[in-house]
Amino acid sequence: QIDWDGLILSIQSDKVDCAIAGMSITSERMQSVDFSDPYYKANIVAVVAGDGPYADVVNLTDLKGATLTSSLNTVWYDVLDQVTDYATKDAALDTFASMVSAVHAGKIDGFTCDMPSAKSILMTNPDLKIIDFEGGTGFEVSDEETDLGIACKKGDTELVDKINEVLAGLSQEDRDAMMDEAVAAQPASN
C-alpha cells in the first residue's frame, strides 16, 4: 500500500503502472499524470456523530456552529471553504481513523469525504451518520472534483486506451456494484 501523497510519484517513477485510488480528475493532477475516463462519480458527504447535534442536517447552513475537517490535499478539505461563514474549518487530519477519533472525542463535529469512503467508515463505526446532501443543498462541486479516474504515467496512451476500453463496457450498475464490493472488502481502518 502506498500513502496518498506518494501515489503520483509512484506512477511517475514506474513503481506502479497506475493508481485506482478514488483520485479525482483535476486539472492540477493532469499536469503530472494522465487519467482514464471517469470510472465513478463520488459525491461529497459529511460524516457526523449519529446522536450529535448535526445528525439531522439537510443543507449546508444547518451546519452553523459546527467544527469540520478532512484530509489535506483533497477536494474534500477544499469544499469546507464553502461553510466558513457559519462553521469552522479545522486543521486537516491525516487519516480517517484520526477523524473518527476526533468526532468521538468531541474535538470536531464531523468531516467530509466521498460516499464510498463514508460507507466504508460506517462499516466499523455504526454510531456515525452520513449526511448526503441532495437536490442542490450541499457543496458546490464540479465534475472535475467528483469524477474519479485511474491515474497513469504521463504519455502512456496505450495503457489509458486499454483502461478506457474496459470502462466503456461497464454499465453504471456494474460500477456501483464493484464499488460496493470494494467497500465491503476493505472497511476503512485509517
Question: Which residues make up each language-model segment?
Answer:
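Acidic, polar ligand-binding/catalytic clefts
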Residues: 1-62, 135-143
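Periplasmic-binding protein-like
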Residues: 41-48, 124-167, 184-190
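Hydrophobic residues within well-ordered alpha-helices
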Residues: 11-12, 63, 103-104, 163
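Short helix-initiation/N-cap motifs at beta->coil->alpha
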Residues: 1-9, 55, 91-105, 116, ...
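Ligand-binding clefts/hinges and TM-proximal coupling segments of bilobed small-molecule sensing domains
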Residues: 75-93, 130-134, 161-190
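Short helix-loop capping/hinge motifs at secondary-structure junctions, enriched
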Residues: 51-59, 91, 155-161
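Short loop->beta-strand "edge-of-pocket" segments that line small-molecule binding or catalytic clefts
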Residues: 58-74
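A ligand-binding cleft/hinge motif common to bilobed small-molecule-binding domains
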Residues: 6, 21-32, 79-82, 109-144
